[in-house]
């Protein structure tokens, strides 16, 4: 849409480079085309019309969500394999394929296709959920993590190195490679979860601001218009 056809032109950058390509150079070159740029990419925040905007989202379907936390660890993946996180997920799924038990924790796992109606079953009983973002990049935070905090599930997390700027990492278990994950899963226990009830609640409250992506986009644009 050409600039003179809209009252306000807004660019919202959502995906990491491995998914849609890296448009950083193009955005820098043509930044004046937009009135407002919403981005999680630090390298674009020096542009005069850019604002930091965390992707977030929450895919829990609250109308049918029935939490009953047990000794369960869950994991979800697709069959994709082109992003760094995709590749790691396939390794994890292969490692879990024959595992029904992780140090006394039952395993709930799924690889699509087929797609499931929703993700509730991954979080209703699980005290832990293995989270792998598509890339390890600062500020790249999606529903994969937010769903954990929203459902009061402790994430076993591979993702943004600066996640501590947004959430209390004392309520997370962070890993950087498959070997670290194996060690974590071999030593899972309930005590880690049960000792962090207050931190789980803190991260739940922090996560709320990121649940509704479209409402946040709308509110940010309205704020820009009001202040323009």
Regions found by a protein language model. Give the residues of each.
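Catalytic toxin/effector domains delivered as secreted proteins or via bacterial secretion systems
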Residues: 17-18
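Pol beta-like nucleotidyltransferase catalytic core
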Residues: 1-13, 22-104, 112-228
């Amino acid at each position: 849409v050409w600039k003179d056809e809209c009252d306000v032109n807004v660019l919202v950058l959502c995906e990491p480079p491995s998914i849609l390509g890296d448009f950083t150079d193009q955005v820098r070159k043509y930044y004046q085309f937009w009135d407002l740029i919403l981005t999680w990419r630090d390298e674009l925040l020096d542009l005069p019309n850019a604002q930091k905007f965390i992707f977030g989202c929450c895919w829990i379907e609250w109308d049918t969500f029935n939490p009953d936390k047990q000794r369960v660890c869950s994991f979800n993946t697709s069959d994709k394999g082109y992003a760094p996180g995709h590749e790691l997920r396939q390794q994890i799924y292969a490692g879990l394929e024959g595992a029904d038990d992780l140090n006394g924790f039952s395993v709930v796992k799924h690889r699509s296709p087929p797609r499931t109606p929703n993700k509730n079953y991954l979080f209703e009983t699980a005290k832990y959920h293995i989270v792998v973002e598509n890339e390890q990049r600062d500020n790249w935070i999606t529903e994969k993590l937010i769903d954990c905090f929203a459902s009061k599930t402790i994430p076993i997390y591979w993702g943004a190195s600066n996640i501590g700027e947004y959430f209390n990492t004392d309520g997370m278990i962070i890993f950087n490679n498959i070997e670290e994950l194996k060690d974590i899963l071999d030593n899972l226990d309930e005590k880690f979860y049960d000792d962090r009830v207050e931190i789980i609640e803190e991260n739940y409250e922090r996560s709320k601001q990121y649940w509704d992506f479209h409402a946040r986009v709308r509110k940010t644009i309205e704020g820009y218009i009001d202040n323009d």
